[in-house]
Amino acid sequence: MTLRHISVLKEEAISFLNINPNGVYVDATLGQGGHTLSILNHLQDGFLYSFDQDLKACSDIQKKLNPNWPIEIIHSNFSNLKLELAKRNVFQLDGILFDLGISSCQIDDSQRGFSYLHNAPLDMRFDNRQKLTAQEIVNFYSFEKLKNIFHIYGEEKKAALIAKQIIKNRPLKTSYDLVAITDMFYKYHKGHSAKKIFQALRIEVNQELEVLKQALSQSLELLKKDGSIVVISFHSLEDRIVKHFFKKNSVFEFPKKLPIMSVDYPQPALRIITKKPCIPSEVEMKNNPRSISAKLRAAVKNI
């Protein structure tokens, strides 16, 4: 079944961005443009830069935009934030939004290999310009490397067994070739047998966790004082990175016996405004099942 992509936690994200109508903003994950259009609706003399590494997403949204709207779409990975903005003489932002979820359109594209529900070549690249594909990983990575990817990125308990069977059954070309292997171990398991393996491969293909760390660091440098950063994540690995980054930059740690009074502490870079992650309402989860795992964290630049 094909689902229309619905932006998750859209109202909450816009609220936490606290948009200045004349400010400069980045939507780091354009996708199908839901959050981008919401930000645009709050701008007057401001400007928005929307990033996406998926050329199709950029092209699809570009066709729908009024040429007079204050927006530029940038076909690039969000790990290139500073580089791409510097090309445009932009060195400070009033706010930045990350929606880390894969779009429904990408999942439902039967030729891109993101879904275990479609028989497609094992590709999984967000950006077709890059060389590494999921097919190369399953056919050429060593047992140890496959096992580690499945264990770390997929949190898969049977990582070693699945990796061993993949090597035994090489070459694998399609998503159904891979599903046939995971079904050996989870035939009667609740949920799909390949879910964690597909997640792990997608993360490895696109280096999702590494580029997220890079983009968060760059965001902190780019934000003005009182600028907002909002991140929506969809699995524990992403959320853990965001949580750690916010915490690390919102406190100062000194040796316990150092004679410094609390009033002398330098101000931390960030002030966290979501003490606990914001999650979708029951109504949103019912209307959009893909929102169920979403968590939103937000912070404001202090200095």
UniProtKB/Swiss-Prot annotation:
Keywords annotated in UniProt = Cytoplasm, Methyltransferase, rRNA processing, S-adenosyl-L-methionine, Transferase
Q: Where is this protein found?
A: Cytoplasm
Broad EC category? transferase
Name the InterPro entries on file: RsmH (IPR002903), SAM-dep_MeTrfase_MraW_recog (IPR023397), SAM-dependent_MTases_sf (IPR029063)
Q: Name one GO biological process term.
A: rRNA base methylation
The reaction(s) catalysed by this protein are: cytidine(1402) in 16S rRNA + S-adenosyl-L-methionine = N(4)-methylcytidine(1402) in 16S rRNA + S-adenosyl-L-homocysteine + H(+)
Listed Pfam families: Methyltransf_5
Asked whether the keyword Phosphoprotein is assigned, the reply is no
Give me the segments passing through the membrane.
none
Please give an example of a GO cellular component term from this record: cytoplasm
Q: Which amino acid positions bind S-adenosyl-L-methionine, per UniProt?
A: 33-35, 52, 78, 99, 106
Per the UniProt record, which EC number(s) apply here? 2.1.1.199
Gene3D superfamilies, per the entry: Putative methyltransferase TM0872, insert domain, Vaccinia Virus protein VP39
Query: Does Oxidoreductase show up as a keyword for this record?
Result: no
Q: What GO annotations for molecular function exist for this entry?
A: rRNA (cytosine-N4-)-methyltransferase activity
Q: Which NCBIfam families match?
A: 16S rRNA (cytosine(1402)-N(4))-methyltransferase RsmH
What is the protein's known function? Specifically methylates the N4 position of cytidine in position 1402 (C1402) of 16S rRNA.
Family indicated by similarity: Belongs to the methyltransferase superfamily. RsmH family.
Protein name as annotated: Ribosomal RNA small subunit methyltransferase H
Give the encoding gene's name.
rsmH
